C-alpha cells in the first residue's frame, strides 16, 4: 500500500482528470454562440452561413438526445465532490508540523521497543529450533546406527 503522500498525489491527479473530463463534456455538449463582428467564418458566403445555421439546430438535437439520457453533470459533480472529500481526509491524516518531531520520537521509541521484543522472540524461536534440530539429528543417528547393527548381525 502506498504512503499517504503518494495517495494524496494520486487523488489530486484523479481530481485533475475529473476536471479535464468534465470540461471536455461541457465542450462537447455546448451550443455554438455568436460573437459580434465574427459572423462570417473563413471563406463562407452569407448564403452558406444561413444554410449552415439552419442545419445546426437539427444536428444539436441529434447530439443532445443520447447525452441527455446520461446525466454527465450529475456524474462529474459527484466524482469531483467525492475526490475533494478524499483529498481533505488525506490532508487531515498527514502529521502536523508542530508535533512532528515529538511524534517521530515517540514513534521511533515504540518501533524500537517492538523491534527489541520481536528480536527476543526470534532468538527464543531460533534457540528452540536448534535444540529440536539436535534432537532430530541424534534420533537419526540412533536410527542409522540401529540399521547398521541389524545389517551386520544378520
UniProtKB/Swiss-Prot annotation:
Q: Which GO terms label this protein's molecular function in UniProt?
A: transcription coregulator activity
SUPFAM superfamilies named in the record:
Mediator hinge subcomplex-like (SSF140718)
InterPro entries xref list: Med7/Med21-like, Mediator_Med21
Q: Name one GO cellular component term.
A: mediator complex
Task: Give positions of region: Disordered.
Answer: 37-71
**Origin superkingdom:** Eukaryota
The places in or outside the cell where this protein is found are: Nucleus
- Indicate, by first and last residue, each region the UniProt record lists as having compositional bias (Low complexity): 44-71
Q: Which UniProt keywords apply?
A: Activator, Coiled coil, Nucleus, Transcription, Transcription regulation
Oligomeric state and interaction partners are given as:
Component of the Mediator complex.
Record-stated family: Belongs to the Mediator complex subunit 21 family.
- Chain's role: Component of the Mediator complex, a coactivator involved in the regulated transcription of nearly all RNA polymerase II-dependent genes. Mediator functions as a bridge to convey information from gene-specific regulatory proteins to the basal RNA polymerase II transcription machinery. Mediator is recruited to promoters by direct interactions with regulatory proteins and serves as a scaffold for the assembly of a functional preinitiation complex with RNA polymerase II and the general transcription factors.
Protein name in UniProt? Mediator of RNA polymerase II transcription subunit 21
Organism name: Anopheles gambiae (African malaria mosquito)
Gene behind this protein: MED21
Amino acid at each position: 500500500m502506498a504512503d499517504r503522500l503518494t495517495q494524496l498525489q494520486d487523488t489530486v491527479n484523479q481530481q485533475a482528470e475529473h476536471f479535464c473530463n468534465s470540461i471536455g463534456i461541457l465542450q462537447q455538449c455546448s451550443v455554438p454562440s455568436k460573437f459580434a463582428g465574427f459572423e462570417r467564418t473563413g471563406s463562407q458566403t452569407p448564403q452558406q452561413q444561413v444554410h449552415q445555421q439552419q442545419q445546426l439546430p437539427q444536428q444539436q438535437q441529434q447530439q443532445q438526445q443520447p447525452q441527455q439520457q446520461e446525466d454527465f453533470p450529475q456524474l462529474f459533480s459527484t466524482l469531483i465532490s467525492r475526490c475533494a472529500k478524499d483529498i481533505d481526509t488525506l490532508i487531515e491524516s498527514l502529521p502536523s508540523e508542530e508535533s512532528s518531531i515529538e511524534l517521530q520520537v515517540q514513534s521511533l521509541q515504540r518501533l524500537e521497543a517492538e523491534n527489541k521484543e520481536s528480536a527476543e522472540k526470534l532468538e527464543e524461536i531460533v534457540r528452540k529450533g536448534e535444540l529440536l534440530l539436535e534432537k532430530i539429528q541424534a534420533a537419526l543417528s540412533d536410527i542409522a546406527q540401529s540399521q547398521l547393527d541389524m545389517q551386520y548381525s544378520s
